[in-house]
């Protein structure tokens, strides 16, 4: 009888990346990436107080929030900014960039304002993109009040942090995108699903877009009667 010894690497099992990702998901494991700092304040930029403490938020467009996260690619990173309606959790606009310049954030903001009108309050962290003149001036010109999280307090913007967690576990970590166009297409599909089909416990299982537009329509009907 041949001696029994430890298994050699050659005796292992060949599996592809898709199976590895599926098994990692089942075991609730996530890949480890070096996370870029997307919330670093810029020297000399003005910061603003946090305005949401104790505030009752009960309607669309009362408060929006925005944040940036990183998208791990097969090689390197891209960056994603999203603008969300706080009350309904609907993603109003988003952009992907390969740099952390403020331009892609302002583009998303302009799209959201163009489609939905300005919010009463915009809440962000103190990252340099959100303290930049281009961002703050755009908000001031439409009469939006600016609110910023306390430094290092991610819970001040908790709903968009939850969005990032869902996006990464349900979409980003399941892929290894090669190009920005692949990432953009994948993110776009997921956000469309999230807005229009994904049940949300905060509103009785209704998707964010359904809650947003139904509430807007109801408010307009009430105003018309009044």
Task: Show the residue positions of the predicted features.
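Charged DNA-binding/catalytic regions of mobile-element recombinases
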Residues: 1-226
């Amino acid at each position: 009888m041949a001696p029994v010894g430890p298994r050699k690497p050659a005796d292992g099992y060949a599996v592809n990346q898709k199976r590895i990702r599926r098994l990692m998901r089942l075991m609730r494991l996530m890949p480890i990436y070096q996370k870029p700092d997307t919330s670093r304040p810029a020297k000399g930029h003005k910061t603003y107080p946090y305005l949401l403490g104790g505030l009752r938020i009960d309607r669309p467009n009362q408060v929006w929030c925005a944040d940036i996260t990183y998208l791990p690619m097969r090689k390197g990173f891209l960056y994603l900014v999203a603008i969300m309606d706080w009350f309904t959790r609907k993603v109003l606009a988003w952009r992907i960039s390969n740099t952390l310049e403020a331009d892609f954030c302002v583009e998303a903001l302009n799209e959201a304002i163009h489609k939905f009108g300005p919010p009463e309050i915009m809440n962000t962290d103190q990252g340099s993109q959100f303290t930049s003149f281009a961002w703050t001036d755009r908000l001031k010109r439409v009469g939006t009040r600016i609110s910023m999280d306390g430094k290092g307090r991610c819970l001040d913007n908790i709903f968009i942090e939850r969005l990032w967690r869902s996006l990464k576990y349900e979409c980003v970590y399941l892929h290894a995108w090669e190009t920005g166009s692949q990432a953009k297409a994948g993110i776009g599909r997921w956000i469309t699903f999230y807005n229009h089909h994904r049940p949300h416990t905060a509103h009785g299982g209704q998707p964010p877009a359904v809650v947003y537009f139904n509430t807007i329509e109801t408010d307009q009907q009430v105003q018309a009667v009044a």
